[in-house]
Amino acid sequence: MLEINGKEFTPDEDLVIQGDEFSACDIEQPAVIRNPFPYYDLMRQKPIQYGVRGYPPGTVQGVDEPIPAWGVFRYDEVKHVYANHKIFSSQDRMQEASEAPSMMLVNHDQPEHTFLRNVARQAFSPKRVDQDVAPWLAEICDHMLETEGPGNVDFMTNLAADLPARFIAKLLGTPADEYRKIRQFADAYMGTSTQTTEEKLATSIEFNEYFTYHVNERYKQIDAGTAEDNLMTGFIVAEDDDGKKLTPEEVKKFCITMVAGGAESSVFLLGNQIVSFLEMPELYQKMREDRSLIRPFLEENIRRTGPIQRLFRECLEDTMIGEQEIKEGEWVCVFNGSGNHDPSMFENPSEFIMDRPNVGKNLTFGHGIHHCIAALVARNEAAAMMNGILDRYKAVEPGDGEVIFQDRNFINYGPATVPVNFVPA
Protein backbone atom coordinates (compact mmCIF):
# COMPACT_ATOMS: atom_id res chain seq x y z
CA MET A 1 0.00 0.00 0.00
CA LEU A 2 1.29 3.43 -0.98
CA GLU A 3 0.14 6.78 0.43
CA ILE A 4 0.04 9.79 -1.89
CA ASN A 5 -1.22 13.18 -0.71
CA GLY A 6 -2.88 11.49 2.24
CA LYS A 7 -4.71 8.95 0.03
CA GLU A 8 -4.04 5.22 0.06
CA PHE A 9 -3.26 3.71 -3.32
CA THR A 10 -2.45 0.14 -4.34
CA PRO A 11 -0.21 0.03 -7.43
CA ASP A 12 -1.06 -2.38 -10.25
CA GLU A 13 0.46 -5.82 -9.78
CA ASP A 14 2.38 -5.57 -13.05
CA LEU A 15 4.10 -2.31 -12.10
CA VAL A 16 7.82 -3.05 -12.10
CA ILE A 17 8.87 -0.32 -9.63
CA GLN A 18 6.58 0.70 -6.77
CA GLY A 19 6.40 3.14 -3.88
CA ASP A 20 9.06 5.74 -3.15
CA GLU A 21 11.50 4.05 -5.52
CA PHE A 22 9.29 5.03 -8.46
CA SER A 23 11.08 7.58 -10.66
CA ALA A 24 10.93 9.25 -14.06
CA CYS A 25 12.81 6.27 -15.48
CA ASP A 26 9.85 4.02 -14.62
CA ILE A 27 6.96 6.09 -15.96
CA GLU A 28 6.63 4.50 -19.42
CA GLN A 29 5.09 1.24 -18.18
CA PRO A 30 1.75 -0.28 -19.22
CA ALA A 31 0.32 -0.05 -15.70
CA VAL A 32 1.13 3.67 -15.51
CA ILE A 33 -0.16 4.39 -19.02
CA ARG A 34 -3.50 2.81 -18.07
CA ASN A 35 -3.85 5.01 -14.97
CA PRO A 36 -1.11 7.65 -14.69
CA PHE A 37 -2.75 10.01 -12.22
CA PRO A 38 -1.63 8.48 -8.88
CA TYR A 39 1.93 8.36 -10.21
CA TYR A 40 1.70 11.99 -11.31
CA ASP A 41 0.81 12.84 -7.70
CA LEU A 42 3.97 11.09 -6.60
CA MET A 43 6.23 12.69 -9.23
CA ARG A 44 5.05 16.25 -8.48
CA GLN A 45 6.39 15.81 -4.94
CA LYS A 46 9.87 14.97 -6.22
CA PRO A 47 12.52 17.23 -7.79
CA ILE A 48 12.55 17.25 -11.59
CA GLN A 49 14.10 13.93 -12.60
CA TYR A 50 16.07 12.77 -15.61
CA GLY A 51 15.33 9.53 -17.41
CA VAL A 52 11.94 9.64 -19.15
CA ARG A 53 12.34 7.49 -22.26
CA GLY A 54 9.32 7.60 -24.55
CA TYR A 55 8.32 7.57 -28.18
CA PRO A 56 7.19 10.82 -29.84
CA PRO A 57 4.52 10.68 -32.58
CA GLY A 58 5.80 9.02 -35.72
CA THR A 59 8.57 6.98 -34.11
CA VAL A 60 8.41 3.20 -34.02
CA GLN A 61 8.99 1.21 -30.83
CA GLY A 62 11.54 -1.50 -31.48
CA VAL A 63 13.12 0.43 -34.36
CA ASP A 64 13.91 3.87 -32.93
CA GLU A 65 15.96 4.47 -29.78
CA PRO A 66 14.33 6.83 -27.22
CA ILE A 67 16.30 9.87 -26.05
CA PRO A 68 16.30 10.27 -22.22
CA ALA A 69 14.54 13.43 -21.05
CA TRP A 70 13.87 15.47 -17.92
CA GLY A 71 10.34 14.79 -16.66
CA VAL A 72 8.31 17.95 -15.96
CA PHE A 73 5.16 17.29 -13.92
CA ARG A 74 4.12 20.45 -12.02
CA TYR A 75 1.59 22.82 -13.61
CA ASP A 76 3.69 26.00 -13.50
CA GLU A 77 6.74 24.23 -14.91
CA VAL A 78 4.83 22.53 -17.72
CA LYS A 79 3.33 25.89 -18.68
CA HIS A 80 6.78 27.52 -18.46
CA VAL A 81 8.19 25.10 -21.03
CA TYR A 82 5.31 25.70 -23.44
CA ALA A 83 5.50 29.48 -23.01
CA ASN A 84 9.25 29.67 -23.68
CA HIS A 85 9.26 28.22 -27.18
CA LYS A 86 12.48 30.03 -28.12
CA ILE A 87 14.33 28.01 -25.48
CA PHE A 88 12.41 24.73 -25.70
CA SER A 89 12.28 23.65 -29.33
CA SER A 90 9.59 21.49 -30.91
CA GLN A 91 12.02 20.27 -33.55
CA ASP A 92 12.15 16.52 -32.98
CA ARG A 93 15.49 15.01 -33.98
CA MET A 94 14.39 11.56 -32.84
CA GLN A 95 11.42 11.67 -35.19
CA GLU A 96 13.54 13.16 -37.97
CA ALA A 97 16.04 10.30 -37.63
CA SER A 98 13.27 7.70 -37.64
CA GLU A 99 12.74 5.42 -40.61
CA ALA A 100 9.15 6.65 -40.49
CA PRO A 101 8.54 9.97 -42.35
CA SER A 102 8.82 13.22 -40.34
CA MET A 103 5.68 15.22 -41.06
CA MET A 104 4.13 16.57 -37.85
CA LEU A 105 3.31 20.30 -37.63
CA VAL A 106 3.95 20.22 -33.87
CA ASN A 107 7.58 19.32 -34.61
CA HIS A 108 8.40 22.71 -36.14
CA ASP A 109 9.58 26.05 -34.74
CA GLN A 110 9.40 29.71 -35.73
CA PRO A 111 9.20 31.16 -38.33
CA GLU A 112 8.03 28.09 -40.26
CA HIS A 113 5.56 27.21 -37.53
CA THR A 114 3.90 30.65 -37.61
CA PHE A 115 3.28 30.52 -41.35
CA LEU A 116 1.97 26.96 -41.20
CA ARG A 117 -0.22 27.77 -38.23
CA ASN A 118 -1.68 30.88 -39.87
CA VAL A 119 -2.69 28.82 -42.87
CA ALA A 120 -4.35 26.24 -40.63
CA ARG A 121 -6.08 28.92 -38.56
CA GLN A 122 -8.04 29.99 -41.65
CA ALA A 123 -9.47 26.49 -41.88
CA PHE A 124 -10.39 26.32 -38.20
CA SER A 125 -11.79 29.79 -37.63
CA PRO A 126 -14.81 29.87 -35.29
CA LYS A 127 -16.94 31.09 -38.20
CA ARG A 128 -15.99 28.18 -40.44
CA VAL A 129 -16.43 25.70 -37.60
CA ASP A 130 -19.94 27.00 -36.95
CA GLN A 131 -20.96 27.18 -40.61
CA ASP A 132 -19.34 24.02 -42.00
CA VAL A 133 -17.79 21.78 -39.37
CA ALA A 134 -20.63 21.57 -36.84
CA PRO A 135 -23.27 20.60 -39.47
CA TRP A 136 -20.91 17.99 -40.97
CA LEU A 137 -20.31 16.44 -37.56
CA ALA A 138 -24.00 16.35 -36.70
CA GLU A 139 -24.72 14.63 -40.03
CA ILE A 140 -21.96 12.04 -39.54
CA CYS A 141 -23.04 11.29 -35.95
CA ASP A 142 -26.68 10.92 -36.96
CA HIS A 143 -25.73 8.43 -39.66
CA MET A 144 -23.46 6.41 -37.37
CA LEU A 145 -25.91 6.26 -34.46
CA GLU A 146 -28.81 5.43 -36.76
CA THR A 147 -26.80 2.58 -38.29
CA GLU A 148 -25.61 1.24 -34.93
CA GLY A 149 -28.97 1.31 -33.18
CA PRO A 150 -29.73 0.67 -29.47
CA GLY A 151 -28.48 -2.17 -27.30
CA ASN A 152 -25.01 -3.45 -26.50
CA VAL A 153 -22.06 -2.03 -28.40
CA ASP A 154 -18.34 -1.46 -27.92
CA PHE A 155 -18.37 2.32 -28.07
CA MET A 156 -14.69 2.58 -28.97
CA THR A 157 -14.71 0.18 -31.92
CA ASN A 158 -18.11 1.02 -33.38
CA LEU A 159 -18.39 4.77 -32.79
CA ALA A 160 -15.42 6.60 -31.23
CA ALA A 161 -12.85 5.15 -33.63
CA ASP A 162 -14.88 5.99 -36.72
CA LEU A 163 -16.20 9.51 -36.12
CA PRO A 164 -12.87 11.41 -36.28
CA ALA A 165 -11.64 9.31 -39.21
CA ARG A 166 -14.85 9.88 -41.20
CA PHE A 167 -14.73 13.58 -40.43
CA ILE A 168 -11.07 14.02 -41.38
CA ALA A 169 -11.63 12.18 -44.67
CA LYS A 170 -14.46 14.61 -45.44
CA LEU A 171 -12.43 17.60 -44.27
CA LEU A 172 -9.44 16.75 -46.46
CA GLY A 173 -11.45 15.46 -49.40
CA THR A 174 -9.96 11.96 -49.46
CA PRO A 175 -12.28 9.10 -50.54
CA ALA A 176 -15.04 8.67 -47.96
CA ASP A 177 -14.89 4.88 -48.14
CA GLU A 178 -11.21 4.93 -47.10
CA TYR A 179 -11.84 6.38 -43.64
CA ARG A 180 -10.73 3.14 -41.99
CA LYS A 181 -7.30 3.68 -43.54
CA ILE A 182 -7.21 7.07 -41.82
CA ARG A 183 -7.83 5.36 -38.49
CA GLN A 184 -5.20 2.68 -39.17
CA PHE A 185 -2.63 5.33 -40.11
CA ALA A 186 -3.31 7.30 -36.92
CA ASP A 187 -3.05 4.21 -34.69
CA ALA A 188 0.33 3.24 -36.11
CA TYR A 189 1.72 6.77 -36.16
CA MET A 190 0.77 7.53 -32.56
CA GLY A 191 1.93 4.18 -31.21
CA THR A 192 -1.35 2.69 -29.95
CA SER A 193 -1.75 0.12 -32.73
CA THR A 194 -1.62 -3.61 -31.94
CA GLN A 195 0.52 -4.13 -35.04
CA THR A 196 4.00 -5.62 -34.85
CA THR A 197 7.02 -3.33 -35.14
CA GLU A 198 7.46 -4.26 -38.80
CA GLU A 199 3.77 -3.66 -39.53
CA LYS A 200 3.83 -0.24 -37.82
CA LEU A 201 6.84 0.83 -39.85
CA ALA A 202 5.22 -0.37 -43.07
CA THR A 203 1.99 1.46 -42.18
CA SER A 204 3.87 4.70 -41.49
CA ILE A 205 5.55 4.47 -44.89
CA GLU A 206 2.18 3.74 -46.52
CA PHE A 207 0.75 6.74 -44.64
CA ASN A 208 3.36 8.98 -46.25
CA GLU A 209 2.80 7.50 -49.71
CA TYR A 210 -0.98 7.80 -49.39
CA PHE A 211 -0.88 11.54 -48.87
CA THR A 212 1.93 12.06 -51.37
CA TYR A 213 -0.44 10.62 -53.97
CA HIS A 214 -3.54 12.57 -52.90
CA VAL A 215 -1.68 15.88 -52.59
CA ASN A 216 -0.19 15.47 -56.07
CA GLU A 217 -3.63 14.63 -57.47
CA ARG A 218 -5.11 17.70 -55.79
CA TYR A 219 -2.53 19.96 -57.44
CA LYS A 220 -3.58 18.50 -60.81
CA GLN A 221 -7.25 19.12 -60.01
CA ILE A 222 -6.52 22.73 -59.04
CA ASP A 223 -4.67 23.27 -62.32
CA ALA A 224 -7.63 21.78 -64.19
CA GLY A 225 -10.17 23.84 -62.24
CA THR A 226 -11.92 20.73 -60.87
CA ALA A 227 -10.75 20.77 -57.23
CA GLU A 228 -13.39 20.84 -54.50
CA ASP A 229 -13.27 23.48 -51.77
CA ASN A 230 -11.95 21.57 -48.77
CA LEU A 231 -9.08 21.72 -46.31
CA MET A 232 -6.42 20.13 -48.52
CA THR A 233 -7.29 22.52 -51.34
CA GLY A 234 -7.15 25.40 -48.87
CA PHE A 235 -3.66 24.38 -47.77
CA ILE A 236 -2.47 24.43 -51.38
CA VAL A 237 -3.92 27.78 -52.46
CA ALA A 238 -3.25 29.71 -49.23
CA GLU A 239 -0.47 32.28 -49.27
CA ASP A 240 1.09 34.73 -46.84
CA ASP A 241 1.37 38.53 -47.20
CA ASP A 242 4.39 38.12 -49.48
CA GLY A 243 2.60 35.67 -51.75
CA LYS A 244 4.46 32.65 -50.40
CA LYS A 245 2.64 29.33 -50.60
CA LEU A 246 3.17 25.97 -48.98
CA THR A 247 5.28 23.44 -50.83
CA PRO A 248 3.70 20.07 -51.70
CA GLU A 249 5.78 18.55 -48.88
CA GLU A 250 4.36 21.07 -46.39
CA VAL A 251 0.81 20.39 -47.60
CA LYS A 252 1.40 16.71 -46.98
CA LYS A 253 2.77 17.62 -43.54
CA PHE A 254 -0.50 19.36 -42.72
CA CYS A 255 -2.60 16.42 -43.85
CA ILE A 256 -0.57 13.98 -41.76
CA THR A 257 -0.76 16.32 -38.76
CA MET A 258 -4.54 16.38 -39.11
CA VAL A 259 -4.77 12.60 -39.24
CA ALA A 260 -2.16 11.73 -36.60
CA GLY A 261 -3.27 14.36 -34.10
CA GLY A 262 -6.95 14.76 -34.89
CA ALA A 263 -7.99 11.16 -35.41
CA GLU A 264 -6.15 9.63 -32.46
CA SER A 265 -6.65 12.20 -29.68
CA SER A 266 -10.31 12.74 -30.58
CA VAL A 267 -10.97 9.01 -30.30
CA PHE A 268 -9.76 8.98 -26.71
CA LEU A 269 -11.55 12.25 -25.92
CA LEU A 270 -14.80 10.58 -26.99
CA GLY A 271 -13.97 7.43 -25.04
CA ASN A 272 -13.14 9.25 -21.82
CA GLN A 273 -16.38 11.18 -22.19
CA ILE A 274 -18.51 8.04 -22.43
CA VAL A 275 -16.70 6.57 -19.40
CA SER A 276 -17.78 9.69 -17.48
CA PHE A 277 -21.37 8.98 -18.54
CA LEU A 278 -21.05 5.51 -17.02
CA GLU A 279 -19.47 6.88 -13.83
CA MET A 280 -22.03 9.66 -13.34
CA PRO A 281 -25.43 8.57 -14.72
CA GLU A 282 -27.15 11.37 -12.84
CA LEU A 283 -25.32 13.93 -14.99
CA TYR A 284 -26.51 12.17 -18.13
CA GLN A 285 -30.11 12.71 -17.09
CA LYS A 286 -29.48 16.36 -16.26
CA MET A 287 -27.93 16.93 -19.69
CA ARG A 288 -30.88 15.29 -21.43
CA GLU A 289 -33.04 17.96 -19.85
CA ASP A 290 -30.61 20.89 -20.16
CA ARG A 291 -28.18 20.84 -23.10
CA SER A 292 -26.42 23.98 -21.83
CA LEU A 293 -24.65 21.61 -19.40
CA ILE A 294 -22.83 19.87 -22.26
CA ARG A 295 -20.08 22.47 -22.55
CA PRO A 296 -19.11 22.59 -18.85
CA PHE A 297 -19.32 18.78 -18.72
CA LEU A 298 -17.02 18.55 -21.72
CA GLU A 299 -14.51 21.12 -20.40
CA GLU A 300 -14.13 19.38 -17.05
CA ASN A 301 -13.65 16.07 -18.88
CA ILE A 302 -10.93 17.68 -21.01
CA ARG A 303 -9.13 18.77 -17.83
CA ARG A 304 -9.69 15.68 -15.70
CA THR A 305 -9.24 12.94 -18.31
CA GLY A 306 -7.96 14.81 -21.35
CA PRO A 307 -6.32 12.50 -23.88
CA ILE A 308 -2.99 14.22 -24.57
CA GLN A 309 -0.63 13.30 -21.74
CA ARG A 310 2.89 14.30 -22.71
CA LEU A 311 5.08 15.90 -25.38
CA PHE A 312 8.84 16.32 -25.82
CA ARG A 313 10.92 19.49 -26.26
CA GLU A 314 14.65 20.03 -26.89
CA CYS A 315 16.51 22.69 -24.90
CA LEU A 316 18.34 25.18 -27.16
CA GLU A 317 20.41 26.86 -24.43
CA ASP A 318 21.39 26.33 -20.81
CA THR A 319 18.42 27.28 -18.66
CA MET A 320 16.52 26.48 -15.46
CA ILE A 321 13.19 24.80 -14.84
CA GLY A 322 12.41 25.55 -11.24
CA GLU A 323 15.59 24.70 -9.35
CA GLN A 324 16.87 22.26 -11.96
CA GLU A 325 19.50 23.28 -14.52
CA ILE A 326 18.81 22.00 -18.03
CA LYS A 327 21.74 21.93 -20.47
CA GLU A 328 21.65 22.87 -24.14
CA GLY A 329 20.77 19.83 -26.22
CA GLU A 330 18.97 17.99 -23.43
CA TRP A 331 15.37 16.89 -23.81
CA VAL A 332 12.46 17.64 -21.52
CA CYS A 333 9.15 15.80 -21.41
CA VAL A 334 6.16 17.87 -20.29
CA PHE A 335 3.24 15.95 -18.81
CA ASN A 336 0.05 17.87 -19.61
CA GLY A 337 -2.07 15.39 -17.69
CA SER A 338 0.00 15.88 -14.54
CA GLY A 339 -0.32 19.66 -14.78
CA ASN A 340 -4.09 19.24 -15.03
CA HIS A 341 -4.04 17.33 -11.72
CA ASP A 342 -1.76 19.70 -9.83
CA PRO A 343 -3.64 20.76 -6.67
CA SER A 344 -1.71 24.04 -6.61
CA MET A 345 -3.76 25.04 -9.68
CA PHE A 346 -6.91 22.89 -9.53
CA GLU A 347 -8.54 22.31 -6.15
CA ASN A 348 -9.42 18.65 -5.53
CA PRO A 349 -8.14 17.79 -9.02
CA SER A 350 -9.28 14.15 -9.06
CA GLU A 351 -12.90 15.20 -8.46
CA PHE A 352 -15.29 15.99 -11.30
CA ILE A 353 -16.51 19.55 -10.64
CA MET A 354 -18.89 20.71 -13.37
CA ASP A 355 -18.62 24.43 -12.59
CA ARG A 356 -14.88 24.52 -11.86
CA PRO A 357 -14.04 28.26 -12.21
CA ASN A 358 -10.56 27.90 -13.72
CA VAL A 359 -11.17 24.85 -15.93
CA GLY A 360 -10.10 26.86 -18.99
CA LYS A 361 -6.53 26.96 -17.68
CA ASN A 362 -6.05 23.25 -18.36
CA LEU A 363 -3.07 22.17 -20.47
CA THR A 364 -4.62 19.28 -22.40
CA PHE A 365 -4.29 21.03 -25.76
CA GLY A 366 -0.99 22.70 -24.88
CA HIS A 367 -0.30 26.39 -24.29
CA GLY A 368 0.97 29.40 -26.21
CA ILE A 369 1.89 29.16 -29.88
CA HIS A 370 1.60 25.37 -29.76
CA HIS A 371 -1.94 25.33 -28.42
CA CYS A 372 -3.70 22.78 -30.62
CA ILE A 373 -5.23 24.54 -33.64
CA ALA A 374 -7.90 21.86 -33.94
CA ALA A 375 -9.04 22.05 -30.29
CA LEU A 376 -12.28 23.76 -31.35
CA VAL A 377 -12.97 20.93 -33.80
CA ALA A 378 -12.26 18.28 -31.14
CA ARG A 379 -14.73 19.97 -28.82
CA ASN A 380 -17.34 20.03 -31.58
CA GLU A 381 -16.80 16.33 -32.32
CA ALA A 382 -17.39 15.52 -28.67
CA ALA A 383 -20.46 17.79 -28.46
CA ALA A 384 -21.95 16.33 -31.65
CA MET A 385 -21.61 12.77 -30.36
CA MET A 386 -23.05 13.75 -26.97
CA ASN A 387 -26.05 15.46 -28.53
CA GLY A 388 -26.69 12.52 -30.83
CA ILE A 389 -26.65 10.05 -27.94
CA LEU A 390 -28.75 12.28 -25.67
CA ASP A 391 -31.34 12.68 -28.45
CA ARG A 392 -31.79 8.94 -28.92
CA TYR A 393 -31.23 7.23 -25.59
CA LYS A 394 -32.71 7.74 -22.14
CA ALA A 395 -29.68 6.10 -20.53
CA VAL A 396 -26.18 4.81 -21.22
CA GLU A 397 -25.49 1.78 -19.04
CA PRO A 398 -22.50 -0.56 -18.67
CA GLY A 399 -22.56 -3.17 -21.41
CA ASP A 400 -21.39 -6.75 -21.62
CA GLY A 401 -17.70 -6.78 -20.79
CA GLU A 402 -15.05 -4.69 -19.09
CA VAL A 403 -13.77 -1.17 -19.73
CA ILE A 404 -10.09 -1.60 -20.65
CA PHE A 405 -7.67 1.32 -21.00
CA GLN A 406 -4.96 1.35 -23.66
CA ASP A 407 -1.41 0.79 -22.39
CA ARG A 408 0.76 0.91 -25.52
CA ASN A 409 1.86 4.54 -25.69
CA PHE A 410 1.90 7.42 -23.21
CA ILE A 411 0.96 10.10 -25.76
CA ASN A 412 -2.76 9.63 -25.13
CA TYR A 413 -4.81 8.47 -22.16
CA GLY A 414 -8.05 6.66 -22.82
CA PRO A 415 -9.94 3.39 -23.16
CA ALA A 416 -9.35 0.73 -25.77
CA THR A 417 -12.77 -0.83 -25.18
CA VAL A 418 -15.93 0.55 -23.55
CA PRO A 419 -18.90 -1.86 -23.68
CA VAL A 420 -22.12 0.12 -23.28
CA ASN A 421 -25.84 -0.54 -23.45
CA PHE A 422 -27.80 2.22 -25.19
CA VAL A 423 -31.31 2.30 -23.68
CA PRO A 424 -33.80 3.76 -26.20
CA ALA A 425 -35.95 6.70 -25.15
Where are these regions (language model features)?
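Cytochrome P450
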Residues: M1-A425
